[in-house]
Amino acid sequence: MKTASTRFALSALLLFASTDVAVADRRTQVWQADIQIRTLEVTRSKSTMTARIVVFTEKDDEAREARLVILLPLGVGIDRLPPGCAATAGPSMVPALRAAVECDLGSIPDRGFREVVVSTTLPPDLMPKRFGVFTYSATPDPAPGNNYAERTIQ
């Protein structure tokens, strides 16, 4: 026959065990979105270069307030920008030259993507034709190593 104190101890033990499992379950559910550069393609025509960037996200949650920074080749101006993107200011002596483009991508759902296409003028002949892109969001990223890419064309 169980005494009242034994029943109380068993009830307390069961309550503690179920609470501990619930806490462990909450710890394994982490808010995260692996935002990444999926594609960076750069093409060249006679007078322009075009960079096509695809930003993708996965790992359960949406990437909130996603942003993309495009580092432009030296000595280029902007030919075409998509909505939501703005070029950094150029130097006072040659205001047409730009260093970077910043894009607000909004929220990207899990397994969703955003595509951005930017066209620039060609840099002077001896300058490298290299684009660098970096993406990030307000959601914690479990794998930040895939947030950057760069391409150089001839």
Predicted regions span which residues?
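Short beta-strand elements of extracellular/lumenal beta-sandwich folds
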Residues: 44-64
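Short solvent-exposed strand-capping/beta-turn motif centered on an Asx-Ser/Thr pair
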Residues: 56-62, 73-75, 123-125
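Extracellular/luminal low-complexity Ser/Thr/Pro-rich, glycosylation-prone repeat/linker regions
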Residues: 25-34, 59, 87-88, 134-154
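Bacterial N-terminal signal peptides
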Residues: 9-17
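A surface/secretory-pathway sequence property marking extracellular, secreted
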Residues: 65-101, 106-107
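Solvent-exposed, conformationally flexible loop/turn segments
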Residues: 40-48, 110-113
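Bacterial N-terminal signal peptides that target proteins for export
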Residues: 1-9
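Low-complexity, intrinsically disordered segments enriched in Ser/Thr together with acidic residues
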Residues: 105-127
